[in-house]
Each structure stands twice: as C-alpha cells, then as structure tokens.
Amino acid sequence: MELSALTAVSPIDGRYGDKADALRPIFSEFGLLRFRVEVEVRWLQKLASHVGIPEVPALSAAANALLDGIVSNFNESDAARIKQIERTTNHDVKAVEYFLKEKVEVNPELAAVSEFIHFACTSEDINNNSHGLMLKTARDEVIKPYCEKLISELKRLAHEYRDMPLLSRTHGQPATPSTMGKEMANVAYRLERQFKQIMAVEILGKINGAVGNYNAHVSAYPEVDWHQFSEEFVTSLGLNWNPYTTQIEPHDYIAELFDAIARFNTILIDFDRDVWGYISLGHFKQRTVAGEIGSSTMPHKVNPIDFENSEGNLGLANAVFQHLASKLPISRWQRDLTDSTVLRNLGVAVGYSLIAYQATLKGISKLEANAGAMAADLDANWEVLAEPIQTVMRRYGIEKPYEKLKELTRGRRVDAEGMRTFIDTLELPEHVKVELKKLTPANYIGQAQRLVDLLK
C-alpha cells in the first residue's frame, strides 16, 4: 500500500491530515533533516568567522551564498538523498555531513574545508539545536496564532454575552447567578495566563562536544575560547544557550514548554465540557450546516461534535506531552539513547493539539445563545435569592439568618411570590425590604458585567 490519507496509520496524517499541514515542514523527517542541514552549515560558517581557526579562512561572498542556498533551497530531493546515504552509513547525522560534503564539492574554496563540516561535534550538538529550532518555529509560527485566536474568540463571547444572565451550577445544582459573558471571561483569562507562560519558556541549545566539556575542541585549538564561541553560535540561531550539559542538552526546557501547553489544553478541555453541558441544558443552540448528519438513526439530532472532538484530541495530546515531559529530562549518566526515539514524537502531541484547537474554534463559530432558555432556568430557581437575603439579614442583626433561609428553601422550589412573602415577615427597615423585593434571579448577578468590562 502506498502512504496516503487513506492508508496512514496515524489519524494526524490520515483523517485529520489537512488540519496538521502546517506542522509537516517542521516536525516531519524532512523538517528534521532541513534543520540539521541548517545547523551544520551555520557551524561551518561560524568556524570560518574566527581568526583563531586559520585552517578555515573567512569565506568569500560566493561561498557563503552557496551555503545559504543549500539551507534556503533545501527540498524533498535533498532529503531523499540524505536518506539514501543513510542506508549505507546507518547513521542519520553522519548522512547529513556526507550530503553537505557532496553539495560543496562544486566550490573549491568550500571543498578545501569540507572536513570542518561537523568539526568537533557529537551528533547531539546538531540534533539538540535542530529540535530547538523545530520547537521554536512550531511555537512561534503555529501554536501562537491558534492560542491567540482562541483567546480572542473567548473575549468576543465574553463581551457579546456580557448582559446575558445565567443560572450558575455548583456540584451540578442551581447556584448564585452569573452572566454567560463572565463565564467566558473566566476561560479567556485562564488561557491567556498559560499562553504567556508558553511564550516565556526559553528554548535552549548547546554545542560543546561528546560530554559537554569541549574536549575535542580544545585538543585541536586550545587558544580558542570555546565557551564563548559556543554561546555566540547557539544564540545566533535564535536559541538560548545552555552552558552546562552532558552529551545531550538535558531537555528540561522541553518539559517546561510541554507542561505549559498541557495546562493550556486542560483549560480548553474544561471549556469544551462546560459548553457541551450548556448545549445539553439548551443554553446554547448550534447553527446547523447544510448536508450534515448528527445521527445515523435519529434525524433530529445536532450533536456538539466539535467540542467532543476537541476534548478527545486534547486528551491524546496531553497524554503524549506528559510522557515527553516526564521522560526526556532523564538520561543515564552522560547519555543514553532512549530520548532519541521519543524526540521523534514532538510533533505528535502538537499535532493532536492543533486538531483540537481547530475543532473548538469551529464549535464556537456555530454557537448561538438561547436567552429564552437561560431566562426560564433562572425563573424556575428563585431559591437562589436565599443568599442575598440572608446576607442582608446578617447586616441588620437578625438571628440565625442562614438557618431561616435554609428552612425556607432547601430541597424546595420557591417562586417569586413565596420569596417576597418571606421578605415581608422580616424585621428589616422598609426601604431594605423594597430593595430586596427588586431582586430577581436574572438581576442578581453582582459585578459580572463590570468584570467583563475589565477584561483586557
């Protein structure tokens, strides 16, 4: 069978392939090879820039242009050639080195220094920076826009439903009213906080040899300040430098990044479930799409499939994120190879996240608030006004206010007339009774509207 959307084992490349297209140039085998080529080329150019390494003299404009072109024009044919070389070497990074030596043969200046491709490097020097570039690119160019869009949509809903009263539910039971807008604002604020943490994670890199001590570097060029040279190189890639490592960059930052994304995802799961519940209660209707079928046997159904799809994919994403975050920082002594196969799954967790983000956004686009259903829910639960009444009773020194309201309301339905009759029995100033009688479940929303207004 040829690989296609129909034959792919993973739904990321199969059923949901079009939703993960943005990740293919980053996390695929092609993407990894492309970043490896970039790191190897930039290392050679960096060596040529140092006067203390005379065997690699400063490169001419033509030589630099050729090297830059290898990076910028890297294509699938180049990647296929590397894989062909790997069938002989049985070593993926060495195959990249040999590929580059082939590419520079046409330029005598570069051919003369071709043995300085991969100079003093362990494979992990190339790989860790490549993984760093993969994650930085994915975060900044793919994850960030989706996070921003989700937060923006939640803020839009918050302001759109600012004045729409909602019966809250704690423990699944009727509770103090809020507004639908304020509930959306809660989620927007939570997501925004985690998004800031995602973007604040420093993505690290190192290039310091087989065990992190520049052993090979110093043996060849003891006069060069390799510590400083390493920092300059890593930061030139747009990464943050890690000066203390074993053979591998210890991947702590990957755990930090994935834990932050997983928290963002967990909040989104919470949102998906809440909206699912609001749809079940009738508080939200879903705009139908012509031709769509909700159930193979029940023609009337319009199911909350987008939120369910999102919840499922976020669960998968977080399961992978959690394994990566707990496994990658652990490596026996100066390194073992267990991280190598695990690192090939960076895009899996991000892929499931991306599918979920798009599903949530699609679900949001179909939502239509059902103000009538929310109003009916509130009007059927006047007992929620027990809270403000007993609180005012406390202010005016009436004994056992909580207990009196508990006796009136617990396990009972109380209508507007019953609540007002109870207020009349209280020893309160007349103007206070008048104000209490003005309360309804729909207007007892505290500062919910102001809190939406304060959302930036």
Can you describe what each PLM-predicted range is?
Residues M1-R34, A62, I85-T89, G282-F284, ...:
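Glycine-rich cofactor/substrate-binding loops
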Residues E2-H217, Y221-E232, G294, F307-N309, ...:
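A helix-coil-helix interface module used to build multimeric assemblies
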Residues W43-L47, F99, K103, A138, ...:
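Generic, well-ordered alpha-helical scaffold segments in large soluble proteins
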Residues S123, V218-Y221, V234-S236, W241-I248, ...:
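A structural signal for small-residue-enriched, beta-sheet-centric alpha/beta enzyme cores
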Residues K136-K144, E148-I151, K155, A185-A188, ...:
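Short amphipathic alpha-helical segments with heptad-repeat character
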Residues L157, Y161-M164, I198-V201, G205, ...:
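Hydrophobic stripe of amphipathic alpha-helices that form coiled-coil interfaces
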Residues Q194, N240, T246-R332:
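Glycine-rich anion/phosphate-binding loop at the beta-strand->alpha-helix junction
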